[in-house]
Amino acid sequence: DKVGKQARVLEDIGYDGLKSIETAHDPFMPLLVASQNTEKAELITGIAVAFARSPMIMANLGHDLNAAAKGRHVLGLGSQIRPHIQKRFSMPWSAPAARMREFILALRAIWANWYDDQPLEFLGKYYTHTLMTPFFAPTNNEYGAPKVHLAAVGPLMTEVAGEVADGLLVHGFTTEAYLRNVTLPALDRGLAHSGRTRADVEVSYPVFSIKGRDEKEIAAASKAMREQVAFYGSTPAYRPVLESIGVGEVQGELNALSKQGRWEAMGDVITADVLD
């Protein structure tokens, strides 16, 4: 009930998109509730962990939510990182960019079977889908497939977004320098692979921000932001983002603190210059 009320309020005050993340809870359930309490806002998973599920399961989830939302669902996917996929989800990890490309192509093949009566003959390196009988194929196909947006930080995954996705979800942990020098050129390379331009994709960039009504709130928000930046900065895959502003060396320090479980101490490593 709380989710439904909040969704209505956000739509009423002008938000045209509502996003649900996959952290402590499934990202689809809140959006299902929101779909029954809103009329216009896009409902976006931001993100759903692709490699924690098979393409068939994800195809079903995307279809069902898009049908419930009457065509307003955007299936935002992300890879997560190796430790979470292997140790938290107990799923295989390899060549994430290549695997994600195949994952999205598998989704397209499954949906083509459901919506366009195309034979399901997807034979890939990582995923194989060759069986679909009428009993298991959805029939409520009025709204078709959701748009697929892909979260990416590294250049290879960003190229995949440009090649096969409908949109790119830029990570909030992205500097202006990294966006201009790494992300957008990689997106353009991916678009070139598929003969598309930037006009053919949507790009979402949820920047980190610090705000408050007084100095006390600003101080609290700054502390929380330092801890959030430190959390992401501890991940080796995100070191190039820190290097883009000349502070790549702090990644090793943050990683060491994270392995010691010193999460709050990590925030002290992030200076005001880094936040700026």
Task: Cite the ranges covered by each PLM segment.
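Active-site mouth loops of central-metabolism enzymes
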Residues: 1, 48-55, 142-153, 209-213, ...
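N-terminal beta1-alpha1-beta2 module of alpha/beta enzyme domains
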Residues: 1-45, 51, 146
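Acidic-and-aromatic substrate-binding clefts and catalytic sites of carbohydrate-active enzymes
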Residues: 20-29, 51-56, 175-179, 210-212
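Glycine- and other small-residue-rich loops at beta-strand/loop junctions that grip anionic moieties
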Residues: 20-23, 47, 54, 96, ...
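Catalytic cores of alpha/beta
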Residues: 55-63, 212-222
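Internal, glycine-rich beta/alpha segment that forms the wall or movable "lid"
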Residues: 59-63, 67-167, 172-201, 252-254, ...
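Glycine-rich beta-alpha junction loops
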Residues: 81, 174, 205-213, 249
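Active-site pocket-lining/capping segments in soluble small-molecule metabolic enzymes
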Residues: 217-275
